[in-house]
C-alpha cells in the first residue's frame, strides 16, 4: 500500500526522508509498528490522516491482540473499531472486557478469524453457549482456551467444545462450577489424547471419577490444577501417578482428601506439587540430599 499524500506542517530539508515516506508494507509495518505498544499506536493515529491510515492497516494485519495492552478497561465501541478489519488473528485475549463482552460483540470477531489458536475469555460472564459454539465450529485450529470464572460454562457447552476442537492442548476451566464429573469424563474421552494442560480448580463438583478418567486418557498431560476440588482424593492422584508419565506439575492445595502416600510416587519422579510434604518426609529428603543424618533426630 502506498502512503497517502498529505501536506507537511512545515518546510522539509532537501533530501530529508519523513517516516511516512518509507515503504509501508516492506518497512514500517513489519519492522517499526510491530515493535510499538498498541496503546502508543492508538495515540499515534491521532497525529494525522496518514498516520491513522497506517495504524488501521497495521490493525488489520494483527496476529495477536491482547486488550490489556490498551488499558485496564476498554469501551465496547473502541474494541469494535480496533478489531473491525482484523482477519488474521491467531491469539485473542479479552479479559479486560469481561464486564460487558457479549455474544454479539465476540461472535463476529470469531467468524472473521478462523485461524485463531489461542483465546482467553477469563471472567467474561456475559457470554453464553452461543459464543463457545461459534468458537468451536469456526476455529478448528484452536489449541489454547481460557474460560476461567465463566459461570455459564456447563456440561453441554463443554461437550460441544470437545466434539469440535481436535487440536485443543490447553484448557482453563477454573471456577466453572456447573461442570461435573460427567462433563470432564466426556472431555477426557474425546480430547484427552492431545491435552497437555488443564485447570479444574475451585470446583467442588469434580471428584476422583473425573481425575481417573483424565489419567487414563491423557498420556501427554503435563500440568493439572485441582486446587480446591474438595471431592478429589488419593485414589485419583494414585491413578495420575500410574497413567501420566509426562506429568510435570500438580496443584492439590485445599484437596483435603489427598494424602501424602498418594503424592510420594509423583514427588519421587520430580513432579512439582504445591503441597509441602510432612515434616518427617521433609527431613528424610534433606538427609538423602545433604547427608545430615548425624544431626537430625527423625523420631522428634
Curated annotation (Swiss-Prot):
Pathway: Protein modification; protein ubiquitination. SMART domains: LRR_CC. The keyword Metal-binding does not apply. It comes from Mus musculus. The modification N-acetylmethionine is found at residue 1. GO terms for biological process: bone mineralization; dorsal/ventral pattern formation; G2/M transition of mitotic cell cycle; positive regulation of BMP signaling pathway; protein ubiquitination; SCF-dependent proteasomal ubiquitin-dependent protein catabolic process. Expressed in heart, liver, spleen, bone, muscle, brain and kidney (at protein level). Substrate recognition component of a SCF (SKP1-CUL1-F-box protein) E3 ubiquitin-protein ligase complex which mediates the ubiquitination and subsequent proteasomal degradation of SMURF1, thereby acting as a positive regulator of the BMP signaling pathway. Required for dorsal/ventral pattern formation and bone mass maintenance. Also mediates ubiquitination of SMURF2 and WWP2. LRR repeats lie at residues 141-162, 167-188, 194-215, 220-241, 246-267. Part of the SCF (SKP1-CUL1-F-box) E3 ubiquitin-protein ligase complex SCF(FBXL15) composed of CUL1, SKP1, RBX1 and FBXL15. Residues 19-66 form the F-box domain. SUPFAM superfamilies: F-box domain (SSF81383), RNI-like (SSF52047). This is F-box/LRR-repeat protein 15. Keywords: Acetylation, Cytoplasm, Leucine-rich repeat, Repeat, Ubl conjugation pathway.
Amino acid at each position: 500500500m502506498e502512503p497517502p499524500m498529505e501536506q507537511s506542517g512545515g518546510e522539509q530539508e532537501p533530501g530529508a526522508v519523513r517516516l511516512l515516506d518509507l515503504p509501508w508494507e516492506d518497512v514500517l509495518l513489519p519492522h517499526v509498528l510491530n515493535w510499538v505498544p498498541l496503546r502508543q499506536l492508538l495515540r499515534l493515529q491521532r497525529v494525522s490522516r496518514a498516520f491513522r491510515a497506517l495504524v488501521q492497516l497495521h490493525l488489520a494485519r494483527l496476529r495477536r491482540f491482547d486488550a490489556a495492552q490498551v488499558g485496564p478497561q476498554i469501551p465496547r465501541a473502541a474494541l469494535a473499531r480496533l478489531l473491525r478489519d482484523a482477519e488474521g488473528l491467531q491469539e485473542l485475549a479479552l479479559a479486560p472486557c469481561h464486564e460487558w463482552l457479549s455474544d454479539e460483540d465476540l461472535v463476529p470477531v470469531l467468524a472473521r478469524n478462523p485461524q485463531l489458536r489461542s483465546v482467553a475469555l477469563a471472567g467474561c460472564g456475559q457470554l453464553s453457549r452461543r459464543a463457545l459454539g461459534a468458537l468451536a465450529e469456526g476455529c478448528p485450529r484452536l489449541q489454547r482456551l481460557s474460560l476461567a470464572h465463566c459461570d455459564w460454562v456447563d456440561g453441554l457447552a463443554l461437550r460441544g467444545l470437545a466434539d469440535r476442537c481436535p487440536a485443543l492442548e490447553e484448557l482453563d476451566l477454573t471456577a466453572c462450577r456447573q461442570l461435573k464429573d460427567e462433563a470432564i469424563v466426556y472431555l477426557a474421552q474425546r480430547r484427552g489424547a492431545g491435552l497437555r494442560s488443564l485447570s479444574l480448580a475451585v470446583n467442588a463438583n469434580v471428584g476422583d471419577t473425573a481425575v481417573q478418567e483424565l489419567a487414563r486418557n491423557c498420556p501427554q498431560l503435563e500440568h493439572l490444577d485441582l486446587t480446591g476440588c474438595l471431592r478429589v482424593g488419593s485414589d485419583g492422584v494414585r491413578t495420575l501417578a500410574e497413567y501420566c508419565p509426562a506429568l510435570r506439575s500438580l496443584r492439590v492445595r485445599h484437596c483435603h482428601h489427598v494424602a501424602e502416600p498418594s503424592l510420594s510416587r509423583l514427588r519421587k519422579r520430580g513432579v512439582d506439587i504445591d503441597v509441602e510434604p510432612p515434616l518427617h518426609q521433609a527431613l528424610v529428603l534433606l538427609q538423602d540430599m545433604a547427608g545430615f543424618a548425624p544431626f537430625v533426630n527423625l523420631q522428634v
